[in-house]
Amino acid sequence: MKSNASPESFMIRDKNYSIVSCSPETLLLKKGNKIITKPIAGTLRKIKKSNRSSALKFFRNNIKETKEHNMIVDMERSDLSRVCVPGTVKIDKEKYVEEYRHLFHYVTTISGSLLKGMTIKNIIKSMMPGGSVIGCPKVRTLELLNQQEKENRNIFTGS
């Protein structure tokens, strides 16, 4: 985990298995009754003279990156809406750049107020796999993967 330092890292050790995850993306963050997701849709490799403002300009001027980002944000808002009080899912911070050692990511922060009685299992089931991993349409993509692949992916790319 030290060699691939990332803001969203964890390790689970069990008697029968271990899981290590290092990701720049916050798929789920629960703070009291509030749930937050920060989908990443857009990656730009750093070059010598690049900075956040040049990365933001690139993303905003790139139709493909912008459309993909909007698509993933819409999907994550929809996923959150299944576990949140109607009308509470909102974009807190839209289309900004996060800087990492070797690259820039295009990010949006989305939050909502959880429905009463919502469990972490319900939340995870609603959000997994993350939109930036699987793409749109999520359900159909998963169906196609299940038809083509012989084994279930289980723990895969943060999902």
Residue spans of the language-model regions?
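Extended alpha-helical targeting/anchoring segments
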Residues: M1-S159
